[in-house]
Regions:
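Conserved beta-strand edge residues that scaffold enzyme active sites
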Residues: 1, 24, 81-82, 161
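An N-terminal-biased, well-structured beta-alpha scaffold segment characteristic
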Residues: 1-66
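Glycine-rich phosphate/diphosphate-binding loop of Rossmann-like nucleotide-binding domains
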Residues: 1-5, 114-170
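Short Asp/Glu-rich motifs
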Residues: 4-6, 29, 85-87, 166-167
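Generic secondary-structure signature for well-ordered alpha-helical cores
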Residues: 15-16, 30-36, 69-73, 79, ...
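A broad detector of short, well-ordered amphipathic alpha-helices
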Residues: 26, 96-99, 103, 141, ...
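Residue-level detector of alpha-helix initiation sites
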Residues: 36, 96, 137-139
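Glycine/serine-rich phosphate-binding loop and adjoining beta1-alpha1 elements at the start
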Residues: 39-130
Length: 170
């Protein structure tokens, strides 16, 4: 209901409704999620079952070990690559992360939040904050757009000079 669909809508579309997650994991051949599996979900995975989700394995050794032990077939959205070598499922999340990074920075720069009492945009008589962004990929480019949009003075650093030229031309 919270997202605007009633159980009946799902049932009319052919979905089978169950009462608890363990029923889904016990019966489904494929689990499709957005967030990485929680520890209790990893325990419910079974050999040959397909899990398709963002996994973020690098910082989470316990999750990695649990997934390996499950013998499930785990496909990470962030590793799906298109024919041209791009990461089409990672890009939207990266865009959100880049934009949110500037919002979070603005929040933490406020004096009320323990910051240095800086406004990213500045005000008449007070210069805008200086923002340094490391990396001009999808996250960095989204952060750049947000910071420039707020009126900040931005420096973006990347080893790819062609990418920096491309951004400078915008």
């Amino acid at each position: 209901e919270a997202i605007g669909f009633m159980d009946e809508h799902y049932a009319m579309a052919g979905a089978q409704l169950v009462d608890c997650p363990s029923d889904i994991f016990a019966e489904a051949e494929m689990i499709v999620k957005v967030k990485e599996p929680q520890p209790e979900e990893c325990k419910m995975l079974r050999s040959g079952q397909v899990l398709f989700t963002y996994l973020h394995l690098a910082p989470d050794l316990h999750q990695t070990q649990a997934l390996v032990q499950s013998n499930a077939i785990c496909i990470a959205y962030e590793t799906v690559t298109s024919a041209n070598g791009r990461l089409p499922l990672l890009a939207p999340m990266s865009e959100v992360a880049g934009r949110m990074s500037i919002q979070a920075a603005a929040h933490h720069l406020e004096k009320a939040n323990g910051g240095r009492a800086l406004l990213l945009a500045g005000v008449p008589g007070v210069p805008a904050a200086e923002v340094v962004i490391l990396g001009a990929g999808v996250v960095g480019s989204a952060a750049l757009q947000m910071a420039v949009g707020m009126g900040s003075r931005v420096t973006i650093i990347d080893k790819n000079l062609d990418r920096l030229r491309e951004l400078d031309a915008l």
